[in-house]
């Protein structure tokens, strides 16, 4: 795709939570970005009646860390080489200034839908299929700008708290 369409003209849709580590999916994001592409992320969401309906959904903390790191890679000059990971491949340091990271989390932008075209961070939620990877009561990719309670829930999920269905 990169050779045919050129830089900034292609992307890859990735599903997080199907057995890969955070490091593995973020290294894939970095390769796509380095080739000139865009990363579009979805959380694994086991659909009732599908062959994978018994698989567990993505861990919320994992999903939020991957969303944040992917946003840094795609839109904020982040690089997976500057991030730190633990022995299980979980992100332990995003490789950016703490104040900048806090401001980015507070903006809510990294946690919005990213499966639709957009080369600027302002355009990442051009999605017309909201709730493609979750239900309206357990939002994984927000199809709208986050408000303070949404950001608070995301922070709790990133801290490992089991915040999910019924909270929103």
Give the residues covered by each predicted segment.
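A cross-domain feature marking catalytic cores of carbohydrate-active enzymes
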Residues: 12-16, 41-43
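Auxiliary Fe-S-binding modules of radical SAM enzymes
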Residues: 4-7, 26-168
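Eukaryote-skewed repeat-based solenoidal scaffolds used as protein-protein interaction platforms
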Residues: 1-5, 15-16
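Active-site glycine- and acidic-residue-rich loops that bind
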Residues: 15-27
């Amino acid at each position: 795709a990169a050779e045919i369409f050129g830089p900034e003209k292609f992307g890859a849709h990735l599903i997080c939570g199907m057995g890969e580590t955070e490091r593995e999916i973020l290294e894939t994001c970095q390769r796509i970005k380095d080739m000139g592409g865009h990363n579009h992320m979805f959380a694994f969401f086991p659909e009732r009646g599908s062959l994978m309906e018994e698989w567990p959904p993505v861990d919320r903390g994992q999903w939020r860390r991957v969303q944040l790191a992917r946003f840094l890679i795609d839109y904020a000059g982040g690089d997976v080489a500057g991030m730190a990971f633990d022995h299980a491949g979980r992100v332990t340091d995003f490789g950016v200034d703490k104040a900048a990271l806090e401001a980015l989390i507070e903006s809510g932008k990294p946690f919005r839908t990213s499966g639709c075209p957009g080369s600027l961070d302002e355009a990442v939620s051009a999605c017309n299929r909201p709730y493609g990877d979750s239900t309206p009561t357990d939002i994984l990719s927000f199809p709208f700008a986050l408000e303070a309670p949404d950001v608070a829930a995301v922070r709790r999920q990133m801290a490992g708290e089991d915040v999910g269905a019924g909270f929103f």
